[in-house]
Amino acid sequence: MLLGAGCGAGTGSGGGASAPAFDRETAHAEIVAAVEKAGLPKSDLPGIGGPTPTGSTPRPTPSTERERLEERALVCTAAWQYVGPPVDGSRGDLEKAVTALVGKDWVQGERQVEKLDEHGGTMLQITLRKRGWVMYARHTGVQQSLTMEMISLHATETACMNRFTEQERKALLGDAEQG
């Protein structure tokens, strides 16, 4: 499940002109522009936070508590993802997307590289922040019997997600039984 960018107005404060709104749609547009500029692979998976495609099927009404929480969390999120066969140079292209986002005033923070398995699978995660939003840019390459790549840019509005109780966040993240 993906969670991401949000529900706040993102207005400026103080005397002078207000900063333009930075909301879910703006975050999504910046993600998509960075993906396209970097040349990341085309994804047939739905993005989160962009305009609803004309003629799309409405989402079903949530029937469980977890589904209701997921529906609430969607308004806090903007995301793009690719899951599929490996594409040459995609990790470097993710780095280019991060550079493009930094050019849009996202501030790059922590960078982690983690070994996933003994077959050479790794995960790269770069954290970015902008105006109350946190984004995780991730690239995962798995080298096992089914070789695949997962690439995602996932932004979440902090104030929007803070509206969830600790118990609701655990349920969203699948930790309810463990915590």
Go through each PLM region and give its residues:
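Bacterial signal peptide processing site
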Residues: 7-11
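Compositionally biased P/S/T/G-rich terminal and signal peptide-adjacent segments
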Residues: 18-79, 177
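Extracellularly exposed regions in secreted/surface proteins, prominently low-complexity, repeat-rich
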Residues: 25-40, 131-179
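Long, charged/polar, surface-exposed segments that mediate recognition or autoinhibition
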Residues: 72-123
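Mature extracytoplasmic/lumenal regions of exported proteins
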Residues: 104, 120-141
